């Protein structure tokens, strides 16, 4: 594979990454309007259901929001190279957001979800905490590449904060009852993690080729 092909592949990956973050942003706006409006609009049908656990739900939501917003900056090589100190600050904010969101999500899962959905939510919370903890330990030990790989896995799970709500907005899924939407969310989680692994493989393959191509051109 020549240097031009490698450069084209990396450029395509950069464009795809920007497109994914744009799509995520649009989905987030949709979710705010459709699923979270009850927080300020108490006439919304969901208000009566969530009002008893509002003060558990808000910290969970804010923690997830912090992770969701700060995450994309962690994957920008340009931002990391130009603003390393800010990269680290935002990384700490990302960790803090998840550290807040996970305990509240566990409580909400145990008290406000059916058994089948509870198992999914607890698995999601455990995977979110585990992937983030591995990324954190890796960077503390100086294993930057491993840190980046696990951050991708962690952020993939973070995106389910949005994508699962978009999924249940589909009438045939959200209105189909637990027997439909719980398997659908499991499928979405698996697909999300598979896509994350494919992205890691793509990036590692061409990032690994690029230095050798540069050496050959000298």
Ranges and model annotations:
Residues 1-218:
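Alpha-helical membrane insertion/targeting regions
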């Amino acid at each position: 594979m020549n240097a031009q092909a490698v450069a084209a592949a990396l450029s395509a990956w950069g464009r795809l990454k920007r497109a994914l973050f744009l799509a995520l942003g649009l989905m987030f706006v949709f979710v705010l309007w459709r699923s979270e409006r009850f927080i300020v609009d108490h006439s919304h049908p969901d208000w009566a259901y969530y009002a008893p656990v509002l003060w558990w739900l808000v910290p969970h939501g804010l923690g997830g929001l912090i992770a969701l917003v700060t995450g994309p900056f962690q994957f920008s090589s340009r931002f990391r190279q130009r603003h390393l100190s800010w990269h680290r600050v935002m990384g700490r904010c990302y960790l803090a957001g998840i550290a807040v969101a996970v305990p509240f999500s566990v409580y909400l899962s145990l008290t406000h979800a059916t058994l089948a959905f509870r198992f999914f939510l607890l698995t999601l919370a455990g995977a979110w905490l585990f992937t983030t903890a591995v990324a954190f330990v890796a960077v503390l030990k100086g294993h930057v590449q491993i840190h980046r790989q696990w951050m991708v896995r962690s952020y993939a799970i973070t995106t389910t904060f949005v994508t699962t709500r978009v999924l249940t907005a589909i009438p045939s899924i959200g209105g189909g009852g637990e027997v439909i939407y719980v398997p659908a969310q499991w499928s979405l989680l698996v697909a999300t993690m598979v896509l994350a692994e494919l992205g890691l493989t793509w990036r590692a393959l061409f990032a690994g080729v690029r230095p050798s191509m540069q050496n050959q051109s000298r």
